A protein has these predicted regions:
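Surface/interface-facing alpha-helical segments and adjacent flexible terminal/loop regions used
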Residues: 1-222
Length: 222
């Protein structure tokens, strides 16, 4: 992948946009579904021609669904939101079949973070969500993608094509080795419990991951 001076402005704009998208999705996973959180995500999705969040409204029921999806393991709506748990799991005849966790997925995610200077423990949000957050959680990995794209955008603005390239190359590697290999499966698992805000978030994120990977591959091939 080569980024010359004429391409820096385009790189900055594209990466800034992707950083914003990933950030909005991660924040929706880490916070109580307030009207602001929902509106932010809907605005981002709408800008991409996606209206799947247009009908979602904040409510006590939706807030309870947030708890059930992430923290109440006995709930029928609860699923695992970490790569190590989803990696070998599957949906069979409408039921989720969990396999044993794969610790190496978590370890590799941490190695990627350390390479880029990203600390998932500094993510902010609802107290329980951030205090129980694992390094290979969906929100952690999406936030990392936001971080990498932001780094690429900042480097492009600063006129540093080498740093921009390094951030985008690592972003592509993370997508290829991590998110692209489990985001769609997570979305399928989330849908088992029905079409709710969180199933739509998972599906939207999987679409974003696929789009981003396609664009990064095209950029690298130039």
């Amino acid at each position: 992948m080569s980024i010359d001076s004429q391409a820096l402005a385009a790189t900055s704009q594209a990466s800034r946009g992707m950083s914003t998208v990933y950030e909005a999705v991660a924040e929706a996973l880490l916070n109580i579904p307030s009207s602001t959180v929902i509106a932010d995500l809907d605005r981002i999705a709408s800008a991409m021609g996606d209206d799947r969040f247009a009908s979602v409204e904040a409510s006590p029921d939706l807030e309870q669904r947030f708890y059930n999806r992430f923290f109440v393991s006995s709930s029928a709506f609860h699923i695992a939101w970490s790569e190590s748990s989803v990696w070998n799991s599957s949906v069979v005849e409408g039921h989720i079949e969990y396999a044993s966790p794969v610790p190496s997925r978590k370890a590799h995610a941490i190695a990627c973070y350390e390479k880029a200077g990203f600390d998932y423990r500094k993510l902010t949000g609802y107290e329980i969500a951030v205090s129980t957050l694992s390094p290979d959680a969906f929100a952690s990995e999406l936030a990392f993608m936001s971080y990498l794209h932001d780094g690429a955008a900042r480097a492009a603005v600063a006129g540093d094509p080498s740093s921009a390239q390094a951030n985008l190359h690592l972003a592509k590697q993370v997508l290829e080795q991590h998110l692209s290999r489990w985001a769609s499966r997570l979305a399928e698992m989330a849908t088992v419990a029905g079409d709710d805000f969180y199933a739509r978030i998972a599906a939207f994120a999987a679409d974003v991951v696929a789009l981003d990977l396609q664009q990064l591959r095209e950029t690298e091939a130039r």
